[in-house]
Swiss-Prot record:
The lineage of its organism: Eukaryota, Metazoa, Ecdysozoa, Arthropoda, Chelicerata. Amphipathic peptide that shows no antibacterial activity even at 50 uM but shows a low hemolytic activity against human erythrocytes. This is Amphipathic peptide CT1. Belongs to the non-disulfide-bridged peptide (NDBP) superfamily. Short antimicrobial peptide (group 4) family. The modification Leucine amide is found at residue 36. Amphipathic and cationic peptide with an alpha-helical structure. GO terms for biological process: defense response to bacterium; killing of cells of another organism. It comes from Mesomexovis subcristatus. Residues 1-23 form the signal peptide.
Length: 68
């Protein structure tokens, strides 16, 4: 009877260890695949639309007035 309880406890602990490490490893694998996959690389350029390379004279005047 004692042996069965010990085996049951060890089995439950082992199953918890496997399930938690599976979720942890899945998170790492998903992160790496997002970095290396086409979708992950495509999303790196999401802030390029915010940059405007041309600054007009009105923009410079506004910035100078703002910094006073």
């Amino acid at each position: 009877m004692k042996t069965q309880i010990v085996i049951l406890i060890v089995a439950v602990l082992f199953l918890q260890l496997v399930s938690q490490s599976d979720a942890f490893l899945k998170g790492i694998i998903d992160t790496v695949s997002n970095w290396l996959g086409k979708r992950g690389l495509k999303n790196l350029d999401q802030y390029n639309d915010l940059f405007d390379g041309e600054i007009s004279d009105a923009d410079i005047k506004f910035l100078k007035d703002l910094m006073r």
